[in-house]
Each structure stands twice: as C-alpha cells, then as structure tokens.
Amino acid sequence: MTKKSPLISVIMNACNSERYLNECLKSLKKQTYKNWELIFFDNFSSDNTHRVLEKSKIKNLKYFYSKKRLKLYHARNLALKKAKGDYITFLDTDDKWRSDKLKKQINFFKKNKDLKILYSNYYVLNMSKKIKFLKHKSLLPEGRITDRLLKDYVIAILTVMIDRNLLFKNKFNQNYEIIGDFDLFLNLSKKYKIGTIQTPLAFYRIHDKNFSKKINIYIRELKSWISKNEKKFILSGYSLFQLKYYLFKLKIKNVIKLIVNLGV
C-alpha cells in the first residue's frame, strides 16, 4: 500500500451488538484494501459489545462510548466528527462486506474522478447466515437518479462510499432513527451524480430484533419526511406519488401483521 492510497474511515455504530459483531469485524479485517480506520461508536451498550471489539485486536481503531442512548443518525454524526478518511463508509454490526468491497470502490473512484457518491448491490442474509436472496435482480440506476429513488429507494447505506468533504458539508438529520440515509442521499442525488457497482459487495442481515417497533418508527418518520419535503420536491419537478403509495401499502401490511399476531 503506497502512502498516496486514500484513507477510508469505516463508521460503525453499535448498541448491544455482541451477537453478530465478531462476524462483522472479521469481514472488515479481511479487506484486501488495507488503508482504513474504524470509528466505533458504542451507543450506550450494556452487553459484551466492547469485549468482543477488544478481542478483535483491530489496531486502527477509534472507540467512543455514549453515556446515554442517542438516535442512530445523531450517533452517526458524532462518529463522523472523529473520522480522518478521504472517503467515508458505513458498516453496521449485524452486516458484513465482501473482502474486496473497499478496493473495488476505491478503484471505481479513481476511474471516475467526477463522482462523489458510490453504492452497490448486496445480498440479504437470514439469521442462520445463509444467503436468502440477491436484493436487486435488475440493473441499479446511476447518474442523476432522484426520480428513480423516489419510486424505489435502492441505496443501502452498508454499500455506500462517499467523499469526506461532501458528507461533512451535508450531514445526517440527527432527529432520525431509521431514514436518515434516505433523507441525505435523496437530497444529494438532486445535485450530484451517483455511481453504481452492479456486483453485490455486502451482506445485509435480517432478523427479528425489535422488528415491529422499527416498522412503526419507519412509518412515522417517512410520513413526517413526506409532509416536510413534498412541496420542495414538487417545486423541483419531482413527484412523490410512488413514495406516498409505498407508505400506504406499508401501513396496510403493518396493520395486517398486527391483526394476525393478536389473533383477531
């Protein structure tokens, strides 16, 4: 690795994350691109998260512990303040990366110097670590993709790599628990081209931890986002019809799930 190789800051936010953390950290340590630092923000964990992290013996680590539970995107912003990298990436503790994820993305940026944001396809894992499916079967959009994102938001934060300066000028809305990345990347897509690697470079894990609670928060945040941003996007020539329809379907599915669980 030459001295001119860009430094990558990997942002990892954790809250009682011992279950999958070791597997996640192993995927980071196996990266073929070695010039990275890990910014680990422990969001008031009460389990063995810190012990698992210590056992990993990651040398290029910056560890921070919050003395109170913060909303996720508030915690992400605080972690970002500690980052020194030229590029920023995000890896949550229940997910993992392919070993060449960072290398492929750095090489893509080198070949496309006008780009500031990049994402990729990914696999979805179930709780038993088995690949459940490839998330996106069709080609992912690239370039100016705001219209597409409003119809089908395809960017997963664990696949994103973004220019440090751009992210520091446009931080996450810290009031969000779930849709902070949606809010940020959608707004950035109006001003910047977004690059795509069609190859799946990450593994997103689905599990039942607080699932119903998270769905309710997601619906509430998305409804609030539409209310606050609809006029701005319409004035810019975009339609939020598909997004509102998606929210409607999500509400219906959640009600049905609740009825089934209650045995009504």
Across the structure, where does each feature detected by a protein language model lie?
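N-proximal low-complexity "stem/linker" segments adjacent to membrane-targeting elements
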Residues: 1-29
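Acidic helix N-cap motif at the loop->helix transition within catalytic regions
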Residues: 19-22, 47-55, 96, 100
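A conserved acidic beta->alpha catalytic loop
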Residues: 27, 42-51, 92
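Short beta-strand/loop segment that forms part of the nucleotide-sugar
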Residues: 36-44, 64-66, 93
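Glycine-rich, basic loop-to-helix element that forms the pyrophosphate-binding segment
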Residues: 66-83, 104
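Short aromatic/hydrophobic "clamp" motif used to bind/position activated sugar donors
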Residues: 88
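Conserved donor NDP-sugar-binding/catalytic core segment of glycosyltransferases
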Residues: 100-132
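Conserved nucleotide-sugar donor-binding catalytic segment
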Residues: 138-218, 222-225
